[in-house]
Amino acid sequence: MKNMLLKDAEERMKKSTEKISEEFSHMRTGRPSPAILEEIKVDYYGVPTPINQLATINVSEDRSLIIRPWEKNMLSHIEKAILASNLGLTPINDGNVVRLNFPIPTTEQREKWVKLSKEIAEKGKIAVRNIRRDVLKEAKEMEKNKEMTEDDLRRFEEELQKLTDKYVEEMDKLFEKKKKEIMEF
């Protein structure tokens, strides 16, 4: 039973880490990345559709994304969806492709993004600690109901703390990686 609780805790902590990693991938950093467009939906004949299902998205060498729709009539729809997304980018429609230029961010913008990244990582750490709290509560209930001995509970707490430390450290690593990505130019 103890192992099942640990396994459940690890699974939930891993999901929290993956969610934070995904949030970081959608964050704007000043560097062109197709991932920034993944959440944007375009009205495709009445159906909200992700841009990457309507076009190819390439990173060009001049700090821009090139969006080449498979149907030319989608250019204006893609342009409108990007403008509505509040990414802070202005799409340029040249009749064949939509181009998104990524200007070099100011130091102030980068510091703001680092602060936002830190908040996201902190949110992830809080989620991991909440998982620890919930699982520990279950284990203490088991000990109270004589399903687990006091010694088993103590060992369980130590193992759970190691697991928690591992995933909190993982959140810190994700943040440091994102911070480095934001600040490097």
UniProtKB/Swiss-Prot annotation:
Transmembrane segments: none annotated. One of its GO terms (biological process) is translational termination. One of its GO terms (cellular component) is cytoplasm. It comes from the Bacteria. It is found in: Cytoplasm. Its main location: cytoplasm. Pfam families: RRF (PF01765). The keyword Mitochondrion does not apply. InterPro entries: Ribosome_recyc_fac, Ribosome_recyc_fac_dom, RRF_sf. Keywords: Cytoplasm, Protein biosynthesis. Responsible for the release of ribosomes from messenger RNA at the termination of protein biosynthesis. May increase the efficiency of translation by recycling ribosomes from one round of translation to another. PANTHER family: MITOCHONDRIAL RIBOSOME RECYCLING FACTOR PSEUDO 1, RIBOSOME RECYCLING FACTOR. This is Ribosome-recycling factor. The lineage of its organism: Bacteria, Thermotogati, Thermotogota, Thermotogae, Kosmotogales.
